[in-house]
Amino acid sequence: KNTGRRPNYRECEMRDGECNAKVAKTAEPDSKTNTTGNNSFAIKTSTLLLAVLLF
C-alpha cells in the first residue's frame, strides 16, 4: 500500500517491490535463560518476611 510516506525499512520486508509488514517474533524463553538470581532473591526476601512476622 502506498500511504504517501516513505516506508520504514525496519517495519517492513520488501517483496516484489512492495513493503510488506514484518511478522513479529514472539519472545519464547529458551532453556539457557539464567533465572537463578531472581529465584534466590525471592527465597531470601520470603525468608526474611517470615522471620519478621514470627518474631
From Swiss-Prot:
Glycosylation sites: N34
Keywords: Cell membrane, Glycoprotein, GPI-anchor, Lipoprotein, Membrane, Trypanosomiasis
Main location: membrane
GO cellular component annotations of the record: plasma membrane; side of membrane
Subcellular location: Cell membrane
InterPro entries cross-referenced by the UniProt entry: VSG_C_dom_sf (IPR027446)
Domain of life (superkingdom): Eukaryota
Membrane topology: Lipid-anchor; GPI-anchor
Positions annotated as propeptide: 39-55
Residues anchoring lipid (GPI-anchor amidated asparagine): N38
Purpose: VSG forms a coat on the surface of the parasite. The trypanosome evades the immune response of the host by expressing a series of antigenically distinct VSGs from an estimated 1000 VSG genes.
Protein's name in the database: Variant surface glycoprotein ETAT 1.2
